[in-house]
Amino acid sequence: MLEQLPYLALKTPPKTTALLKAECADFIVKEHLGYEMSGDGEFVALYVRKTDCNTLFVGEKLAKFAGVSERNMGYAGLKDRRAVTEQWFCLQMPGMETPDFSQFELDGVEILTVTRHNRKIRTGSLEGNYFDILLRGAEESDELKARLDFVANFGFPNYFTEQRFGRDGHNLTQALRWAQGEIKVKDRKKRSFYLSAARSEIFNLVVAARIEKSTINQVLPNDIVQLAGSHSWFKADEKEDLTALQVRLENQDILLTAPLIGEDILAASEIENEIVNQHSAFDPLMKQERMKAARRPLLMKAKGFSWAFEPEGLRLKFYLPAGSYATALVRELVNYTEE
């Protein structure tokens, strides 16, 4: 799926090959919630380091150890399994003593902090993640350095990557079958996965079309643009001066966006409208599930982006806001294979 999408850096696929996640320690993720724990309240908050562990599995084990239902366990986001990741979990335990988590044992899990918090850590309630990635076997070259400079200065396509679509695109296939009435989906989690895959596919196709038409950095009539640093957006319609908006785009005051489709269809640029209309089979599903339309930036620029060539390969360090994928950045640099 992702291999069919165009590249932005140098307009060509990378020549350098590398191994991604050859070892768990090659892919380090540290969650940034954007707020501090209150220190008191009915929730026990745990900052956990996991190595080669599934987020849900660890959360379930923590809940079982504390003697509470899995429904009373919360986390901000799922993290890669084959990695070393640090993230917060919470357990709702009103009027109960904080368990002695020094007695908690699970292979690959280390509890770094135990405190209290006054509200549940909910899915999506994080600002972003810090990444430390080693691309094994990536050798220094002029081509790779040019790609690094490009990504540092101009960013990368904000594609959804393989995690969003399931193994071999299974979630997208099931979403289409569901939309066409071939299957019924009763499981709430599966419904969410399938809807996300459908919305992500359409988003990716719009980004790809903008790259192919060389309009990824050009404000088009009826584009939906987002104010940088916020979730507010407006349409570049006849009331707006496109030349002035282009200057604001180049000054990074605004961002171009593509759709995460929902029940309310919003007309936008011709490129976007054409792709959305081609996938109208999903429209009844979006209305049935009461999905709210949203916008997502076409491009993403990593904060604190740095790199160093080491004996084992290329090390990258950067920060991305929640919802953006490190592998979307990596694919602009190297032709990687995941272990």
Curated annotation (Swiss-Prot):
Catalytic center residues: D80 (nucleophile)
A cellular component term, taken from the record's GO annotations: cytosol
Domain of life: Bacteria
Molecular-function GO term, any one: RNA binding
Keyword Isomerase among UniProt keywords: yes
Any GO BP: pseudouridine synthesis
Protein name in UniProt: tRNA pseudouridine synthase D
Source organism per UniProt: Haemophilus influenzae (strain ATCC 51907 / DSM 11121 / KW20 / Rd)
